[in-house]
Amino acid sequence: KVQDLLLLDVTPLSLGLETAGGVMTVLIPRNTTIPTKKEQVFSTYSDKEPGVLIQVFEGERTRTRDNNLLGKFELSGIPPAPRDVPQITVCFDIDANWCLNVSAEDKTTGQKNKITITNDKGRLSKEDIEKMVQEVEKYKAEDEEVKKKVDTKNALENYAYSMRNTITDDKITSKLPTEDKKKIEDTVDGAISRLDGNQLPEVEEFEDKMKELESLCNPIIAKMYQGVLAQMVLVLLIMADAPTGSGGAGPKIGEVD
């Protein structure tokens, strides 16, 4: 008896795009059955960034430079905003004919752009694919170290910029002593300056800088919020102790619109 067999096409390599630190963020993992469609939301890397470059890669390595570039396009017209604020939806859509459509859309404006990548242009050969898959284990330790460095760097960067945005908020700076604000500014500027360097230091250096930032900033910010909370509690206590006006008296003048 001959049994019916269902043959499924799968992606030979992972598909993704380049994100901060030159690493590949995978949207469609290797061996995913096609057709398939995946979406993920990304944001900008710098303040007031007017556009982003979407670079599409296939491969299994952590760094995009070790993978194969399939194509790229720009999404422009993003309104000026602090980093991490814009919401950009990226969609990878592979049809049954191996045609890969990659689109990006800014949620705020509806601005969008896309690229279509066919299976016969710029793709790796069967031999190259097999070689790349075999290299995954060979470079596993190296790739894990790179990813750890980039993740630690990104965490420090996010915290530093978050603190910078915090101390430039007028609602917050009005409650922050000038001396404390200056301390945070100097430490944050020093961290960002180090991050902007071309070198990728060891993980320990990023972790030490993060501890330095947190040990300085967290107590100052916590103290400020405690002061604000104390003021709110005081106001509530005063309101609770105030006469309620019960006893038949009508509304006082000025209380009626």
From Swiss-Prot:
Transmembrane segments: none annotated. The keyword Iron does not apply. Keywords: ATP-binding, Nucleotide-binding, Stress response. Signal peptide: none annotated. The keyword Secreted does not apply. One of its GO terms (molecular function) is ATP binding. InterPro entries: HSP70_C_sf, HSP70_peptide-bd_sf, Hsp_70_fam. Pfam families: HSP70 (PF00012). It comes from the Eukaryota. Belongs to the heat shock protein 70 family. This is Heat shock 70 kDa protein. The lineage of its organism: Eukaryota, Viridiplantae, Streptophyta, Embryophyta, Tracheophyta.
